[in-house]
A protein has these predicted regions:
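Conserved class I S-adenosyl-L-methionine
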Residues: 100-112
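Conserved AdoMet
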Residues: 29-87
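Conserved beta-strand signature within the Rossmann-like core of class I S-adenosyl-L-methionine
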Residues: 228-234
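Polybasic, low-complexity RNA-engagement segments
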Residues: 1-40, 284-287, 294-452
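Helix-to-beta-strand junctions that scaffold the AdoMet/dcAdoMet cofactor pocket
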Residues: 129, 224-226
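Conserved SAM-binding loop of SAM-dependent methyltransferases across substrates and taxa
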Residues: 113-129
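S-adenosyl-L-methionine
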Residues: 139-174, 181
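Mobile active-site "lid"/loop adjacent to the S-adenosyl-L-methionine
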Residues: 142, 174-219, 235-242, 261
Length: 452
């Protein structure tokens, strides 16, 4: 282990604690999942994660790819230490005064691949019901597609996926009530999982990350409302990217540090936040701290023209789409694609489209082929899809895998037309049943590629 890194770790968590951590870096990485509370499935074997009601530690890593309910969004594979950030968010959410007459507005700034986004979404729905909007942003174009897919699998219609630099959010002056910034870092917490993270570590890289993190927070800061809450997190250990950056935010941007008084097994309390370190917890490395904004800011910057939503080529939104959902939705048509957002969030989503590059919002409903709507795979996964909207057909494990592999399946006893394929009661997606065979509507981009 790099001697300079040893010094950084000892500075951050103390010499004795660092010795425990060093001995753990050679041990195998743990495996954990977080269940989707809005997609009920049979109990999974595992040990509870103490700070996450829906978290489970697994004794060994199964083939998640060959588990159909993984593709149904029944759970998300997430490191247990990462779930602690969701725990801090929940504690803050439960203590906050919810706004009246509008949804609570939350931003997950550096959201890919979506673990923390889906954790936040579950907490928001539990505490706020339908009265929230969660913007999940990822600036890297190569990663935003994975984020959008994972959000679709989770199935919550109150999540908006965007792809913008943090600077773009400055125009949304005071819009967000809460921001999670899980900022890019030197990755010291991933040393056990990623040998490249060890090889790439250097003091220069730490300094580079520290400066970049400050720039990211300073850029997004105007979009946080006065008295709004920032959760700052990294997957690294050193003080420069963690406690010292938190103090910099407080001193330079105008914020008060919130207490780090949670007492969870194995979690180390640092000067301003929490550090989760292998050897003390089963998961990987994670840091987080929270602050409340005390500085005032400007409101929305006006004067920008709305981004074009594209032509609908003379198509019209079909009648009767409300019957697909168990919530009132507002439908939109771009080209031949129909999308829907919850009616009470429509004004927020329209406004966000004026300032940001919105990748997805609400739920993709389907594609028009003439006057026929071909249902979208994302609608099958939505937690607000009405149970009676399409005929449902339950399949066994092997047939579910064949469907997810995009092999041809036949369900001659099911009604002809569009049918919702389910496994263990959870929708996997649509087929068009022709009687002797089915045309699969499962996206090529999500198909299982390994042998089944």
């Amino acid at each position: 282990m790099n001697d300079k890194f040893r010094k950084y770790l000892e500075e951050a968590i103390g010499t004795d604690n660092a010795l425990v951590a060093f001995s753990a870096f050679d041990s195998p990485a743990s495996v954990s999942v977080r269940l989707n509370p809005f997609k009920k499935s049979d109990p999974m074997p595992g040990r509870p994660v103490s700070w996450c009601r829906y978290g489970l530690m697994l004794d060994q890593r199964p083939s998640f790819t060959l588990d159909p309910i993984f593709h149904a969004g029944a759970y998300y594979v997430q490191d247990s230490s990462s779930m602690f950030v969701g725990y801090v968010f929940r504690k803050l959410l439960e203590d906050c005064r919810l706004p009246q007459g509008r949804p609570l507005r939350v931003l997950d700034l550096c959201a890919a691949p979506g673990g923390k986004t889906t954790d936040l979404a579950a907490s928001l729905r539990t505490v706020c019901g339908d009265d929230f909007i969660l913007v999940a942003n990822e600036v890297m174009k190569a990663r935003v597609g994975v984020l959008a897919d994972n959000v679709a699998l989770w199935g919550d219609p109150n999540v908006v996926v965007t792809s913008d630099d943090p600077r773009a959010f400055a125009s949304l002056g005071g819009y967000f009530d809460m921001i999670l910034a899980d900022v890019p870092c030197s990755g010291e917490g991933m040393f056990r999982k990623d040998e490249q993270a060890q090889l790439q570590w250097s003091e220069d890289n730490v300094a580079l990350c520290e400066a970049r993190q400050r720039r990211i927070i300073a850029d997004v800061w105007p979009s946080l409302a006065e008295n709004g809450v920032l959760i700052y997190s990294t997957c690294t250990f050193n003080r420069y990217e963690n406690d010292l950056n938190v103090r910099w935010i407080s001193d330079n941007l105008g914020a008060e540090l919130l207490p780090n008084d949670a007492d969870e097994p194995g979690v180390i309390r640092t000067e301003y936040g929490y550090s989760l370190v292998p050897g003390f917890v089963e998961g990987e490395g994670q840091y987080c701290a929270s602050l409340r904004k005390t500085s005032s800011g400007d409101g929305l910057v006006s004067g920008r023209s709305p981004k074009s939503t594209g032509s609908s080529k003379g198509n019209q939104i079909p009648d009767g789409l409300d019957a697909y959902f168990c919530r009132k939705m507002k439908f939109a048509l771009k080209g031949d694609t129909v999308t829907a957002v919850p009616e009470e969030l429509a004004a927020d989503v329209d406004m966000l489209r004026q300032y940001l590059h919105v990748i997805s919002a609400g739920c993709a409903v389907g594609t028009l082929k003439g006057k026929i709507l071909v249902p979208d795979a994302d609608m099958a996964l939505s937690i607000i899809l009405d149970d009676s909207s399409f005929p449902r057909y339950e399949v066994d494990h092997q047939t579910a895998l064949k469907y997810l592999h995009r092999d041809t399946i036949a369900i001659p006893e099911a009604p002809k037309g569009y049918v919702l394929i389910c496994h263990m009661g959870l929708p996997l997606g649509f087929v068009k049943n022709l009687g002797n065979r089915c045309n699969s509507l499962h996206p090529q981009s999500r198909r299982i590629r390994m042998n089944i």
